[in-house]
Amino acid sequence: DLVTCDIVEIRKEKHSIEAEIEKILDADIDKEYDLDEKVDSILDEQEEEIEFHNADRRQLFWMTKKRLANDFGVILNNEDRFSDIAHQILDYLWDEDFIHYTCSDNQVKNVIFASIDQFMKGFEEADSNVYEKIKTYKRKLIPGTEDYDIIYHRLYEEELIKRGLI
């Protein structure tokens, strides 16, 4: 979106910009992956206690993740997270002379934010469409079963391909 945007002058090749943006996104994903691994580790250590109290592991996972998120530098609120990533991308591209602009930083950041938001909404919409399709199946599929997972993943991949996301 930055390449086609009228308010931004591109000073390096599109593929090099994409590569740098991918690094920023991967770093953010890696931080959350590390957080998830730590939370899983903590819950694994407490497995007997969790079973004894008949606690919901998913709920404990999210509670623990929320508590540790700041320590790992992970922002859990999507809007705040996308805004932070957009700032990181903008700062990097400007500092390394990938782009130039004469408008406000916020205008360019908003282009980046909207692009991230639209991209992520494509995945959410694909997920919703898959759930709707599965609901219409004559044979009722139970979430969590092998049949459900196979059909869900096949339909989800088809939706992502249809939207050009993979």
Please state what every model-predicted region is.
Residues 7-11, 98-102, 142:
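Charged, low-complexity interaction regions
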Residues 1, 20, 24, 42-46, ...:
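A general alpha-helix detector
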Residues 124-166:
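Alpha-helical oligomerization segments
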Residues 1-58, 62:
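N-terminal interaction modules that seed assembly of large macromolecular complexes
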